[in-house]
A protein has these predicted regions:
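Conserved GNAT acetyl-CoA-binding A-motif
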Residues: 110-123
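Conserved acetyl-CoA-binding loop of GNAT-fold acetyltransferases
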Residues: 134-144
Length: 160
């Protein structure tokens, strides 16, 4: 992993295109916590590169961070329902602020789309760091579940 002190200058945040789908899915498949296979993505969630490319033309958008041309992490959201669908960071870049950056980009977009409240589903297992990460950023559990995942919500900050 690059040193976190020198990585900030090398990080490039940009909006995803359909051409980025294979590299971002490779990042999602590389994660150790909440691991998943391509077959599980397709069979359990109906997620394919073709389907995502189609949805990116209408209601799905995503942002990624690159470091030296390599996809380090990404996040995607759904404007039709205010959901942050995924946040994933390659293990080589964990702890470098990548997840926070891509999540902020998606949240900003969803709020700009008119959602006063956005949501995501996270594994409630306390051994998985995701829920703590989200709570540290202001997300709150609401007690609802989506399958085996717990729903967390973020309310749009009031203008100052």
């Amino acid at each position: 992993m690059p040193s976190s002190s020198g990585i900030d200058a090398a990080i490039r945040l940009r909006e995803m295109t359909a051409a980025d789908l294979d590299p971002v899915l490779a990042v999602r498949l590389s994660t150790h916590e909440n691991a998943i296979t391509r077959q599980e993505l397709e069979e359990d969630y109906g997620i394919t590169t073709e389907g995502l490319a189609r949805d990116m033309k209408t209601h799905i958008r995503g942002w990624l961070c690159e470091v030296d041309g390599r996809v380090a992490g990404f996040s995607m959201g759904d404007a039709s329902n205010g959901e942050v669908q995924v946040v994933a960071v390659h293990p080589d870049f964990e702890g470098c602020g990548i997840g926070r950056r891509v999540l902020a980009a998606v949240c900003d977009w969803l709020f700009a789309e008119g959602h006063a409240r956005i949501w995501l589903a996270a594994n409630p297992d306390l051994d998985i760091r995701a829920t703590g990460f989200y709570e540290k950023l202001g997300w709150r559990r609401n007690g609802a579940m989506k399958g085996e995942d717990e729903i967390l919500v973020l309310v749009k900050p009031s203008p100052r």
